[in-house]
Amino acid sequence: MNAIANLAATLRADLGECLADLAVDALIDEAELSPKPALVDRRGNGAHADLHLGLMQASALSLWPCFKEMADAAQRHGRIDARLRGVLGQLGRDGEAAMLRTTEGVNTHRGAIWALGLLVAAAALEPRRTQAGEVAARAGRIALLDDPAAAIGDSHGERVRRRYGVGGAREEARLGFPRAVRHGLPQLWRSREGGAGEQNARLDALLAIMSVLDDTCVLHRAGRVGLAAMQDGARAVLAAGGSASLAGRRRLCELDRRLLALNASPGGAADLLAACLFLDRLPAVSGGWAGSL
């Protein structure tokens, strides 16, 4: 019996490590993707005076233990209820504290901890069911539960949500990440099937999200004017053939210049792109552990 218990514990650890690896890889791949309009990438800081690519990479790596612990907690608990929600909330706050220690107080990935933490936990709950829509729907069920220990929010995102009447990251999660599942992922797959390279396919996925998302990061920095510039500009790139086409590339440069002039950085869309990359890879890597659980 001890050998069986030890094997089960090893398999659970492997699952948690794999999911944490996927989440961190998604964050790093999102950060390194270039050229992203007004976002930190290999070219520079975008619209952010306090961020750079190395900081984004270090921040992502600092979150590995947080994601691992979230996966382990979800697998141990085995069901979606208020107790699991409370545990995940505390782990998320601990992860945010670790991030802030790494970045010396700069908020690099607060929104990503929320989005990817939910998706990691959702994947760990039912490791044999890894299709994007199913995982996102489970994450939404977790997000619908309130965390009684959470502080009353007065973040930029919360203030923007109240001022402009938009849903923000909380609603996106509670709805099962529709901008990622219904817009980002389908565009990623279409661009790949159309012959675009992986980097261009990912850029197109980001643009698809930007075209429909009420991004609270953009609203905070540039209001409705900035949001319209982001959404209209992203649609124009895709309508011109996407980032892999010459016309689309020109439109992308125009969008980058416009958002930089407005100091508008689509950080919410970037978080959802990372969610897309996580969900996209999950079925391909799950075979190594799903069949053993």
From Swiss-Prot:
TM spans (from-to): none
Catalytic reactions of this protein: 3'-dephospho-CoA + ATP = 2'-(5''-triphospho-alpha-D-ribosyl)-3'-dephospho-CoA + adenine
EC number of this enzyme: 2.4.2.52
GO-annotated molecular function: ATP binding; triphosphoribosyl-dephospho-CoA synthase activity
Keywords: ATP-binding, Nucleotide-binding, Transferase
GO biological process: prosthetic group biosynthetic process
Top-level division of the source organism's lineage: Bacteria
KW ATP-binding (keyword) present: yes
InterPro entries reported for this sequence: CitG (IPR002736), TriPribosyl-deP-CoA_syn (IPR017555)
Family recorded in the similarity comment: Belongs to the CitG/MdcB family.
Xref: HAMAP family: MdcB (MF_01883)
Function summary: Involved in the formation of 2-(5''-phosphoribosyl)-3'-dephosphocoenzyme-A, the prosthetic group of the acyl-carrier protein of the malonate decarboxylase.
Database matches in NCBIfam families: malonate_mdcB, PRK01237.1
Protein name per UniProt: Probable 2-(5''-triphosphoribosyl)-3'-dephosphocoenzyme-A synthase
Natural source organism: Pseudomonas aeruginosa (strain UCBPP-PA14)
Gene: mdcB
